Curated annotation (Swiss-Prot):
The chain crosses the membrane at residues 35-57. This is Protein OPG161. Coiled coil: none annotated. Pfam families: Chordopox_A33R (PF05966). It comes from Monkeypox virus. The lineage of its organism: Viruses, Varidnaviria, Bamfordvirae, Nucleocytoviricota, Pokkesviricetes.
Length: 181
């Protein structure tokens, strides 16, 4: 064995031996911590991939359900919309179902008559059905304006999104489609 010649060499040899043991312990801890970090990263990646696949499947289910709901509602609105009204009297209660073969908006049914008629004929036809021509002010700021545009209004002028000079002219000879409400 090596014998140090002075105290300084003796301390340095001794401390190097202790330091070597500490390095081996630190290396083991670093390896264990590094392994734990790698394992946790792999688990995180796997869970993220699994969640992404799950969310993609759910998104496809929601989109197909939404597409079916939009299609069903469009068919229902186009075919007929109906409302349920309860009529309550003092003795009995009745369920009254009112159907609308047209556009339903805020309790009113807008039925399109695609035959072209003059204002007077359209007004008389709506009166025979116990209804009236729509007011421009009622439909101008709603989604209905896209449907009732260029049809007869209750004031005798065509319903349009914009006002122009021709609306004040004589429209007695014109024929248009019309809605009854």
């Amino acid at each position: 064995m090596m014998t140090p010649e002075n105290d300084e060499e003796q301390t340095s040899v001794f401390s190097a031996t202790v330091y070597g043991d500490k390095i081996q312990g630190k290396n083991k801890r670093k390896r264990v911590i590094g392994l734990c970090i790698r394992i946790s990263m792999v688990i995180s990646l796997l869970s993220m991939i699994t969640m992404s696949a799950f969310l993609i499947v759910r998104l496809n289910q929601c989109m197909s359900a939404n597409k079916a709901a939009i299609t069903d509602s469009a068919v229902a609105v186009a075919a007929a919309s109906s409302t349920h009204r309860k009529v309550v009297s003092s003795t009995t209660q009745y369920d009254h179902k009112e159907s609308c073969n047209g556009l339903y908006y805020q309790g009113s049914c807008y039925i399109l008559h695609s035959d072209y008629k003059s204002f007077e004929d359209a007004k008389a036809n709506c009166a025979a059905e116990s209804s009236t021509l729509p007011n421009k002010s009622d439909v101008l700021t709603t989604w209905l304006i896209d449907y009732v545009e260029d049809t007869w209004g209750s004031d005798g002028n065509p319903i349009t999104k914009t006002t122009s000079d021709y609306q004040d002219s004589d429209v007695s000879q014109e024929v248009r489609k019309y809605f009854c409400t």
